[in-house]
Structures are given as structure tokens and as C-alpha cells.
Amino acid sequence: MGILDALLGGKVPTINVEEAYRRLQADDTVVIVDVRQPVETRSGSVPGAVLIPLTEFGGRLRELPTDRPILTICRSGHRSPLAARQLKRAGYQVTNVAGGTLAWEKAGLPIVERPGQAGAG
């Protein structure tokens, strides 16, 4: 582990979107956290995702269960590792989803409309 990894909370495991989807289907205890801004979810989100924008993340960690595996996802895979590192530092069992919702959609995986987002904007 490099110095930067140590300062940022250590390395976080990363999986692709297909593996994330398999985990969500196989284990109903897995929580997926979407760290995008609400406006970014207008085009849809991963089914069952909990929306906690990265800008609010530190103050909202208590909303997440400490006894369940957590996946983090964002739009393209740049913000979710930051959230994952925060979770790891706080003692959560966390895995980052590479490629974000762009890769999720490209893979043809299910997307759902977020409540309250229809026709926005």
C-alpha cells in the first residue's frame, strides 16, 4: 500500500458492474450507495440504490448499516472510490463499482427512475 492509499484510508476492493449486479441479485443484505448529486439521477439509478451525494457523505454515514456489505457507485467511477475510502476508514465492509452508472447502462443492466425525478428539468 502506498503512502497516498494509507492517507486516504487504504485500498478498497473494486468490482465491475456485472459483478455488482450479481452481488445485488444474490445477497439482499448488500446496500448500494449512489454518490451522485440528485440532479444527476434524473436519467435513472441502480435499482434499490441509496442516494447520498458525495458532498454530504461525511455527515450522513450514520444512515448506513455497519453490519451489511456496501457497494459505492457514481457516474463514471471517479467519486465513488472517495466515498468508499471514507466508509472503509469508518469500519464499513465496502467495495467500489468501477465505471459507475455509465458502465452500468452500457452493460444493459436495469435502471429505475428515481421517485420525484420524473420530468425534472
Please tell me what each predicted stretch does.
Residues M1-V30, P38-P69, S80-G121:
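Rhodanese-like catalytic fold shared by cysteine-dependent sulfurtransferases
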Residues D34, G77:
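Conserved G/P- and acidic residue-centered "switch" motifs that form tight phosphate/ATP-binding loops
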Residues I73:
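Short, surface-exposed ligand- or partner-binding patches at beta-edge/loop junctions that are enriched
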